């Protein structure tokens, strides 16, 4: 086997066949049926693959799950529980996502994580929030509120103490000093 043949096989492995994207065409092949064919309809031997259907099925299941979570919250108007979590490592983010998938609200405080770890964890939670159609709101410099789709968070324009100092200090203040 030459190098060219190996290379061609490698390319063929990763390319899509044009045939698979075309709709299924019925061919004039004989269909074998049993003696009791009047009771059961005959099925063709070759059936198209179900890969395109599974993607649409996953999307519809996601929408159904989101609606199910919204309906559950409307039925259960008892007490609302907000879990408070202090993650110390990145692996704690999966537990937080499990709580969100269970239709619970979580207040997350990243004070025990480094800034790099907290950013990485927050990116993971933000992605999970988009998948589960939740809400992620910053409520303090190191605290975030993660809520499911059925919880509405009304946050006024909060100015955090750290943001006030950084927002007011600028180059204009240096120029306006009186000596």
UniProtKB/Swiss-Prot annotation:
Database matches in Gene3D superfamilies: SepF-like protein
Region (Disordered): 22-55
Residues passing through the membrane, by range: none
Keyword annotations from UniProtKB, A to Z: Cell cycle, Cell division, Cytoplasm, Septation
Polar residues composition bias: residue spans: 33-55
GO BP: any one term: division septum assembly
Compartments where located: Cytoplasm
InterPro entries named in the record: Cell_div_SepF, Cell_div_SepF/SepF-rel, SepF-like_sf
Biological function: Cell division protein that is part of the divisome complex and is recruited early to the Z-ring. Probably stimulates Z-ring formation, perhaps through the cross-linking of FtsZ protofilaments. Its function overlaps with FtsA.
Protein family per UniProt: Belongs to the SepF family.
Subunit-level organization: Homodimer. Interacts with FtsZ.
Protein name: Cell division protein SepF
Natural source organism: Streptococcus pneumoniae serotype 4 (strain ATCC BAA-334 / TIGR4)
Upper taxonomic lineage: Bacteria, Bacillati, Bacillota, Bacilli, Lactobacillales
Gene giving rise to this polypeptide: sepF
